[in-house]
A protein has these predicted regions:
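Walker B catalytic acidic pair
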Residues: 117-119, 261
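Inter-Walker segment of RecA-like/P-loop motor cores
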Residues: 73-110
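Post-DEXD/H (motif II) to motif III coupling segment of the RecA-like Helicase ATP-binding lobe
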Residues: 121-173
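Conserved ATPase-coupling elements of RecA-like P-loop NTPase cores
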Residues: 108-110, 120-132, 250-253, 269
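Conserved strand-helix element at the start of the C-terminal RecA-like helicase core
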Residues: 54-65, 145-146, 185-206, 213-216
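SF2 helicase motor core recognition
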Residues: 42, 102-110, 135, 240-258
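Conserved RecA-like helicase motor core of SF1/SF2 enzymes
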Residues: 218-219, 234-238, 244-270
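Conserved motor-coupling elements within RecA-like helicase/translocase cores
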Residues: 87-98, 223-239
Length: 270
């Protein structure tokens, strides 16, 4: 640009310009959708992503990425949807939608929508650096969405200027049913245990007394894990035994939740 008089403006050479209405009025939207479990946050984010021409969501669990990959494939077709986790990588040449674990997100790829699920994992001692990096740096060209617990609200407000908060109420009502023996649990029950040994021991007990149980935990291979979930969801067994990772948004048809213990050793302390 060159000024050739007090009020005249001229161009010395062609320059690349962004229309002012795009710069001011079409600023990419950043939202934080917060609330407890069973509020439809992930479902809402998936709908928003699929409404865009391209998108990417980072999940805390491989099984959650796989579950939503299957949903996206049903909506958009296998040729447009990619799955990227530490164990599985399905990336068609024409992929437009990417369902990933947070660590495996191809963050150098430009997409219209970016979502990060369970963003309160920023506070996790082992994985928090990944989720914090995504909070600070992962952005969609048209829309960015963070989903998680309301406890993360102050941190997001501090670190993400211009963020819009959306609160989601729980769909179901929780009630305490008291103590109950494992062998007397009703159908559509899940027992949550805090170690692989406890998961296998409880699953074997349920199988002996109730005829069958599915097992879900991260240590299983992707094929085995997916088969166990499918077996439960299809009604082939009425009980599920899992680690507490199942609480990170995995969508299961469960009416009753029981904890095998009330204290957990996280590798450092009880």
């Amino acid at each position: 640009l060159a000024l050739s008089g007090p009020y005249r403006l001229g161009f010395r050479a062609p320059v690349s310009c962004v229309p002012i209405n795009t710069m001011i009025f079409n600023k990419p939207r950043i939202t934080a959708v917060l609330g407890p479990t069973n509020t439809g946050k992930t479902h809402f984010a998936m709908d928003r992503m699929l409404a865009h021409s391209s998108g990417m969501i980072g999940f805390p669990l491989r099984l959650l990425a796989r579950e939503n990959y299957d949903r996206a494939v049903a909506a958009k077709g296998a040729g447009k949807v990619a799955l990227i986790t530490g164990e599985e990588k399905i990336v068609p040449a024409g992929a437009r939608y990417f369902l990933c674990t947070a660590e495996a997100m191809p963050v150098d790829r430009a997409v219209e929508f970016v979502g990060i699920d369970e963003i309160q994992m920023c506070a996790d001692p082992e994985r928090g650096h990944v989720f914090t990096d995504r909070l600070l740096n992962a952005r969609g060209g048209g829309e960015t969405m963070f989903m998680g617990a309301d406890t993360i609200r102050p941190l997001i407000r501090l670190l993400v200027p211009g963020v819009e908060f959306i609160s989601r109420p729980r769909f179901s009502v929780l009630s305490y049913s008291g103590e109950r023996k494992i062998i007397r649990m009703p159908p559509k029950s899940v027992v949550v245990a805090f170690s692989a040994g406890d998961v296998y021991a409880i699953a074997e007990m349920v199988r002996r007394h109730r005829g069958g149980a599915a097992v879900v935990m991260g240590a299983l291979s992707p094929r085995t894990r997916n088969a166990q979930v499918a077996m439960y969801q299809a009604g082939e067994v009425e009980h599920l035994v899992a680690t507490d990772a199942i609480g990170m948004g995995l969508n299961m048809d469960v009416d009753h939740v029981a904890f095998a213990a009330l204290r957990k050793f996280d590798g450092h302390r009880q």
